[in-house]
């Protein structure tokens, strides 16, 4: 830790199999303290991500809020999307989704979201809002050939529906 590196004691895969919540804790610590996750630990974290399905939603939600409110939240979202998509599969369509609006965004929707999370005050309600604010874009995308760019009719309402369902599944404490 003194060198800014987060690593598991012993075999990382074994540590994550003992308690899968350690996967999210590792991301929270790395985000909060600006740590680099050691290569074997990062690989084991990714390999064991499906074990998060065995963790109670309340515990996942608590760690998710901790990650999102840390100063390195966006970096973790970008570096470990596959982990977040296990706990929030509704957000997976955002990764790699091109809005076809280069005048507004140089990132896909997931990249834009990660940067938006970092750009707002570190309060859980605000960070969760930013996490879900464009989640409806892939579903509502329409390409306007005449205008030469994408449009997203009704995406705020669809994003709100996605957020509501996801946060209920995680038993959000309102």
Regions found by a protein language model. Give the residues of each.
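Glycine- and charge-enriched loop/helix tracts that form the active or gating conduit
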Residues: 1-131, 135-154, 158-174
């Amino acid at each position: 830790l003194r060198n800014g590196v987060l690593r598991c004691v012993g075999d990382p895969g074994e540590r994550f199999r003992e308690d899968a919540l350690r996967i999210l804790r590792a991301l929270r610590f790395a985000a909060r303290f600006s740590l680099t996750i050691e290569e074997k630990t990062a690989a084991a974290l990714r390999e064991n991500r499906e074990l998060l399905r065995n963790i109670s939603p309340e515990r996942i939600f608590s760690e998710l809020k901790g990650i999102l409110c840390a100063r390195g939240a966006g970096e973790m979202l970008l570096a470990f999307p596959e982990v977040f998509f296990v706990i929030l599969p509704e957000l997976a369509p955002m990764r790699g989704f091109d809005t076809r609006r280069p005048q507004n965004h140089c990132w896909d929707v997931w990249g834009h979201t990660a940067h938006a999370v970092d750009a707002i005050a570190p309060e859980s309600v605000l960070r969760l809002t930013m996490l879900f604010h464009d989640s409806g874009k892939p579903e509502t995308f329409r390409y306007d050939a005449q205008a030469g760019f994408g449009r997203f009719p009704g995406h705020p309402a669809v994003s709100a529906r996605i957020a509501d369902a996801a946060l209920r599944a995680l038993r959000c404490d309102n």
